[in-house]
Swiss-Prot record:
Record-given protein name: Protein MGF 360-8L
Upregulating conditions: Expressed in the early phase of the viral replicative cycle.
UniProt key word DNA repair: no
GO biological process: taxis
Species, as recorded: African swine fever virus (isolate Warthog/Namibia/Wart80/1980)
Family per similarity comment: Belongs to the asfivirus MGF 360 family.
């Protein structure tokens, strides 16, 4: 059961306190990264005030790991009292004093890299992906990182796309993997986190959106002009994974060469994509004889999804 003091601090952290009273918050320990600690009213999320995540919501578990890596004892105690999970604390504690504090608060000893990685990635949520990133990133305790230990999970999720993340730096592989999983499972908070943290990986985000059929993220990238790729290269990437009807259609509307797309689908033996591309070619050549399910020139991702959610390839199409 939470103490009265802990409950009081939590209640205050959920209030909007005028700046002239911030010194009181600092005195009470409701202070982190040179800003007041703010909690979401309805969930266990910290509202960050520091850049690059200004205004972002961060789960208490993730915030706790950040505080542990900073050796911020008061904030570690505070977040743990509020319900943050100290389980992975020893993995990130950088000093003996922080390690001892984490043990006192219930941190788990002797966790290895694979246990942490597979344990968190078993459930694909924004919180777990960001938490996994915070545990492994810039962590001298994990300098002997061997990505091959996580290879089975990475390969299972990325399949052929794994060849795009091969790198001599293990951490780079994991960052691209986490980013890809965020896009694949349409985890908006995780996508936002990685986009703000790794702006130089915007092309990777675009590639993931195309390959994993996330037309919503693809549309956002295109509309905001975040990064540019040749449309035929986009179409080729979309055709590499079967049933990528949403992103294939989007690339088609943007002007992708449908004949080249048909060739790519044949080359990769993606039969369902091939039938779909044939239907799109019919739509382009003669809208009156095309399948009535398909409409031309739609770029709204919601409308594209609605249009294609019941689409079934017509195997009777001539090849």
């Amino acid at each position: 059961m939470l103490s009265l003091q802990t409950l009081a601090k939590k209640a205050v952290a959920k209030q909007s306190v005028p700046e002239e009273y911030h010194y009181i918050l600092k005195y009470c320990g409701l202070w982190w990264q040179n800003k007041p600690i703010s909690l979401c009213h309805y969930c266990n999320y910290v509202i960050l005030s520091s850049t690059p995540f200004k205004g972002e919501l961060l789960h208490l578990d993730v915030a706790l790991i950040m505080a542990i890596k900073e050796n911020n004892y008061d904030v570690i105690r505070l977040f743990t009292e509020w319900g943050a999970n100290i389980y992975y604390g020893l993995t990130c504690a950088r000093t003996e004093q922080t390690q001892e504090l984490c043990r006192q608060l219930g941190a788990k000893d002797s966790l290895n890299n694979k246990e942490i990685f597979t344990g968190l990635m078993r459930h694909k949520t924004s919180n777990n992906i960001i938490l996994c990133h915070e545990i492994f990133d810039k962590n001298p305790m994990l300098e002997t990182l061997n990505v091959q230990e996580m290879g089975e999970e990475i390969h299972r999720e990325l399949k052929l796309f794994i060849f795009y993340i091969l790198d001599n730096v293990p951490m780079n592989v994991l960052i691209k993997y986490w980013y890809a999983i965020a896009v694949k499972y349409k985890l908006k908070r995780a996508i936002s986190f990685f986009y703000q943290t790794y702006g130089h990986l915007s092309m990777w985000r675009l590639m993931c959106a195309i390959y994993f059929n996330n037309v919503f993220d693809l549309h956002e990238i295109y509309e905001q002009k975040i990064v540019h790729m040749d449309i035929d290269k986009m179409m080729k990437l979309a055709c590499m994974q079967d049933y990528n009807f949403l992103t294939i259609y989007y690339c088609f509307v943007l002007g992708g060469d449908i004949d080249k797309a048909i060739t790519v689908t044949q080359w990769h033996h993606q039969t369902n994509n091939l039938y779909f591309c044939k239907d799109l070619k019919d739509l382009k050549q003669n809208i009156l004889t095309a399948r009535p399910l398909l409409l031309p020139n739609i770029t709204d991702p919601k409308k594209i999804y609605t249009m294609l959610k019941n689409y079934l390839p017509t195997s009777s199409n001539s090849l």
